[in-house]
Amino acid sequence: MGQMVEFEKNGVKVRGYIATPKWAGPAVLVFHEWWGLESPLSNIKEICDKLADEGFVAFAPDFYKGQYADNPDDAGKLMTEMFEKRMDEVDRIFQASVEFVKECRYTYPKKVGITGFCCGGTLAMYFAAKFPEMVDASLPFYGLPQLTQINAENIKVPIFFILAEKDEFVNNDEVIDIAKTVWKNGVDVQVKVFSGVTHAFLNEKREDVYDPKRACEAWELAVNFFKTYLK
């Protein structure tokens, strides 16, 4: 089990959840869904714990700074405010988080992967494009590219897009177009569309959409991806 922590880097205050492995390992930043890190509907802390069990230092920054939602209306408001008004602050939180995990005594080698779910998947695309020098691999789960500008031509690191066939929020064709742009630049790109499932199918706290079989398959792919490019 991990724990909530707070720290300050270069004047940027960050709070988040960290889980560490038994021995040293590379780091993975995990970006929360529109619910927020502390929401009872979020499984991001559990994702961090599972990554630690696989040998990674996992840190989930709280981009909502303690706020969270337990219903779609409030979640939408928090997410929209973040993408429309707070992206400069979100950038600084990300940069501080990278520094934090690289300085962690459990992090070795000093490599950093990023992943996220829902709007966190959007951020996993966005940061890979905006800060390619700070990222070693990216794995967005059903990210929504329409939420912010994704400069796909700037993505220089291996990236794996995991999508849901029946996702009512994500236009999978738009994500695949991003993947094609990255591939044309000679970057290692993978895309997996899981059939018969919808948005958030990995979230065991959402019984209405959770698919244990597909979730297990997707998780195995994710772990193998990070072990390939970070270790």
Swiss-Prot record:
Substrates-to-products reaction catalysed: 2-(5-oxo-2,5-dihydrofuran-2-ylidene)acetate + H2O = 4-oxohex-2-enedioate + H(+)
InterPro entries per the UniProt record, alphabetical: AB_hydrolase_fold, Dienelactn_hydro, Dienelactone_hydrolase-like
Keywords assigned: Hydrolase
Coiled-coil boundaries: none
Top-level enzyme category: hydrolase
Record-annotated active site: 118, 167, 199
EC number(s) recorded for this UniProt protein: 3.1.1.45
MF terms (GO), sorted A to Z: carboxymethylenebutenolidase activity
UniProt KW Hydrolase keyword: yes
UniProt family annotation: Belongs to the dienelactone hydrolase family.
Protein name: Putative carboxymethylenebutenolidase
